[in-house]
Regions:
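Phosphate-binding/catalytic loops
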Residues: 2, 93, 99-153
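Conserved active-site segments centered on acidic
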Residues: 2-91
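Small/polar loops that bind or transfer phosphate-bearing groups
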Residues: 23, 96-97
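Extended aliphatic helical segments
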Residues: 30, 35, 56, 85, ...
Length: 153
């Protein structure tokens, strides 16, 4: 595990998906609640971003907000695009949802130190060890949104 980029043991997590309207804002909300429930909010900064700019300024997809709300999550992050100039240096971990996200973010890294911050969400799966990614539910149905949340949790 990388050490925090500062001396206060404060970890900065950045979740990445394609458009920042489904998976990464859901991960942001899930991890926020987990950290709060463990009374560790003072040790984490959590954010999310998208690779593309299509949805910048938008709320998360309505379906993800609805499915998240059924589980008690407030998925309300305003979409933004990943910024290689600031986000690599501002983050201790950049957690991507799938292999395409991983490749795209790693290509933007200017050195090995930045690349070492990029990890896959699947590396944290405890109940779904056979899964290789968090599939994008955007073109799917209700079960796809539920499955994405299952994996993220």
């Amino acid at each position: 595990m990388n050490t925090p980029s500062n001396k206060t043991n404060h970890y900065k997590l950045l979740f990445i998906c394609l458009g920042n309207i489904c998976r990464s804002p859901a991960a942001d909300a899930v991890i926020h609640r987990l950290v709060e429930s463990k009374e560790l909010s003072h040790k984490f900064s959590i954010d999310s971003a998208g690779i593309g700019n299509w949805h910048v300024g938008d709320l998360p997809d309505r379906r993800m907000r609805e499915h998240g709300a059924k589980r008690g999550y407030n998925i309300n992050h305003i979409a933004r695009q990943f910024n290689k100039v600031t986000d690599f240096d501002a983050s201790d971990y950049i957690i991507v949802m799938d292999d395409d996200n991983y490749s795209e973010i790693c290509v933007q890294a200017k050195n090995a130190r930045q690349r070492s911050k990029v990890v896959k969400m699947k590396d944290f799966f405890s109940r779904h060890k056979g899964e290789t990614s968090v599939p994008d539910p955007y073109y799917g149905d209700a079960k796809d949104f539920e499955f994405a949340l299952d994996l993220i949790e």
